């Protein structure tokens, strides 16, 4: 099983392709400066770093470039995109909606967007990445993993006590 894990920031997209059978990283990288003319991809495979200067106006274009590199005939990490069995998305803020990882649905996307006010530099970019993956890998399960999920498992008094109650309301 091969899993693509992505972390979309406001102007970057970090990723790893992990082979779960032998717990190895097949490729990893970081697409930097998304939305700027000087955007570029740092792609590492087999210990060698490749730098690809490519204009990516948005996360979808960046993801397409990453997929091109994963399939690069000179140094392929994958034989085809069908080799990807699942995609994991790191999400900074899930609000009170999520206390564990969940499969992506339209409702999940809406709730991540709703929580964008708490993490505007990350959640909105993450939604772009999710939508791009759904479009480019339509039959692959997409899973979201929330940084805030741990806090949903705390006793209510533990997360309310340190702040004035009206902030919680």
Which residues fall in each region the model found?
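Extreme N-terminal starter segment of soluble prokaryotic enzymes
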Residues: 1-4
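A short acidic Gly-Thr/Ser loop motif
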Residues: 6-11
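Short glycine-rich, Thr/Ser-proximal phosphate-binding strand/loop in the N-terminal lobe
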Residues: 12-56
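Short, well-ordered coil/turn elements that cap or connect secondary structure elements
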Residues: 21, 26, 81, 137-139
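Conserved active-site "lid/cap" helical segment
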Residues: 37-85, 115, 129
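Conserved active-site and cofactor/substrate-binding residues in soluble primary-metabolism enzymes
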Residues: 57-61, 65, 103, 107, ...
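Short beta-strand-loop/turn "lid" adjacent to the catalytic site in phosphate-handling enzymes
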Residues: 70, 76-122, 143, 150-160
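Phosphate-binding/catalytic loop of phosphoryl-transfer enzymes
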Residues: 123-124, 130-169
């Amino acid at each position: 099983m091969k899993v693509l894990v992505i972390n979309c920031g406001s102007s970057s997209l970090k990723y790893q392709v992990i082979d779960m059978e032998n717990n190895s990283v097949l490729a990893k990288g970081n697409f930097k400066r998304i939305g700027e003319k000087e955007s570029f991809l740092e792609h590492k495979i087999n210990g060698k770093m490749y730098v690809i200067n490519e204009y990516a106006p948005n996360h979808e274009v960046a993801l397409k470039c990453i997929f091109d590199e994963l399939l690069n005939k000179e140094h392929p990490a994958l034989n085809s995109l069908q080799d990807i069995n699942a995609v994991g998305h790191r999400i900074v803020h899930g609000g009170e909606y999520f206390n564990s990882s969940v499969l992506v649905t339209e409702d999940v996307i809406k709730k991540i967007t709703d929580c964008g006010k708490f993490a505007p530099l990350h959640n909105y970019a993450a939604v772009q990445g999710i939508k791009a993956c759904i479009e480019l890998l339509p039959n692959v399960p997409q899973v979201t993993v929330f940084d805030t999920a741990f806090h949903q498992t705390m006793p209510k008094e533990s997360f309310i006590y340190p702040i004035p109650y009206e902030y919680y309301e």
